[in-house]
């Protein structure tokens, strides 16, 4: 996926995780605003965006209700308290220096019963383990689980811990982008009582509600 495709990706597979009743939504790392545009068109939601790259943020501004160009981690962006029904973090938390602090901050921006919906790469993904164990490779790439711009790496349990230690209750934790195991890996998984099931997924989606 080239840079332009990356910022334009609509992420339609994430739509089903966004609560149907969410009327005010904040999309952090909104790219060119495609996911937010889909939410506005299909749900009639009010969608705000935050995008680090100014040129991309300017494109999103033509699609969303309000867009901030800047870094959510630095405190340069001021968001209203208790305003959003849902905050979206599609493949963005792993790029942050301190995602725990950002998630803790976002709790005050949510309305009662508001949720954070995120997708996070799975470092225990089958292809990563295969390269590491069999090929002795840990190779950073331009995209994917080992994107060279990722600062944090999570397993399924790590995703749960990330949210719980940041003051959230995990409502949904589900794998997406499933791969097929080779017969050898299926056999190994069976011998281990299916303890490798989580390695089928390149990402996990977490829906979490802020603790009161």
Locations of regions flagged by a protein language model:
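Conserved N-terminal segment of class I S-adenosyl-L-methionine
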Residues: 1-82, 86, 100-103, 135, ...
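A short glycine-rich, Lys/Arg-flanked "PGG" loop and its adjoining helix->strand segment in the class I
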Residues: 101-115
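Hydrophobic/aromatic residues located in beta-strands of well-ordered beta-sheets
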Residues: 47, 116-118
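Acceptor-substrate binding/catalytic loop of class I
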Residues: 142-158
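Short N-terminal helix/helix-N-cap motif within the alpha/beta-hydrolase-1
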Residues: 97-101, 128
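A short SAM/SAH-binding and catalytic strip from SAM-dependent methyltransferases
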Residues: 88-97
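Conserved class I S-adenosyl-L-methionine
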Residues: 118-139
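A SAM-dependent methyltransferase catalytic signature shared across enzymes that methylate proteins
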Residues: 159-174
């Amino acid at each position: 996926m080239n840079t332009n495709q990356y910022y334009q990706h609509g992420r339609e597979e994430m739509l089903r995780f966004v609560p149907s009743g969410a009327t005010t939504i904040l999309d952090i790392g909104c790219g060119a605003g495609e996911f937010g545009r889909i939410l506005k068109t299909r749900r009639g939601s009010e969608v705000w965006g935050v995008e680090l790259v100014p040129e991309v943020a300017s494109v999103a501004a033509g699609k969303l209700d309000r867009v901030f160009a800047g870094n959510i981690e630095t405190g340069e962006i001021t968001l209203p308290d208790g305003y959003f029904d849902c905050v979206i973090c599609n493949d963005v938390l792993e790029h942050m220096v301190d995602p725990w602090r950002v998630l803790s901050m976002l709790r005050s921006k949510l309305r009662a019963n508001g949720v954070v919906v995120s997708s996070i790469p799975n470092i225990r993904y089958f292809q990563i383990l295969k390269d590491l164990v069999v090929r002795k490779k840990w190779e950073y790439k331009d995209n994917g689980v080992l994107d060279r711009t990722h600062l944090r790496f999570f397993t399924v349990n790590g995703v749960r811990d990330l949210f719980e230690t940041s003051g959230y209750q995990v409502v949904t934790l589900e794998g997406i982008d499933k791969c097929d195991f080779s017969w050898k890996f299926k056999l190994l998984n069976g011998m281990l009582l299916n303890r490798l099931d989580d390695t089928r997924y390149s990402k996990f989606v977490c829906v979490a509600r802020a603790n009161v």
